[in-house]
Amino acid sequence: MQGTKINDLYEYLSNGHEVSFSYRGDDYSMEPDGDAFTIWKYGNNSKCICRYEIPESCDTKSAIHDFLNAKCFNGQSFMEIEQDVVVVIIY
């Protein structure tokens, strides 16, 4: 991943920051959303490609781990594609 490190990504998400990134020419946003984490794909037909509901009994670090390992990118997780990700902006 270019633009940040995975440990920093955990920190950004756990502190409520939105992370914009590109992957294979497409633009995405990863963000905390109340009781969930989401990934949005932007373009002509913007859509939520992943919504991970945080279980009540789950701590934040475990929830982020599970979210980043959800299969959202054509059968692959963020962790599986992260070497091809470029972080653009952290809000």
Feature-to-residue mapping (PLM):
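Negatively charged, low-complexity tracts enriched in Asp/Glu with abundant Ser/Thr
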Residues: 1-22
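Short, isolated positions in well-ordered beta-strands
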Residues: 28-29
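Short, surface-exposed, low-complexity cationic segments
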Residues: 32-51
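Mixed-charge, Lys/Arg-enriched low-complexity segments
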Residues: 51-91
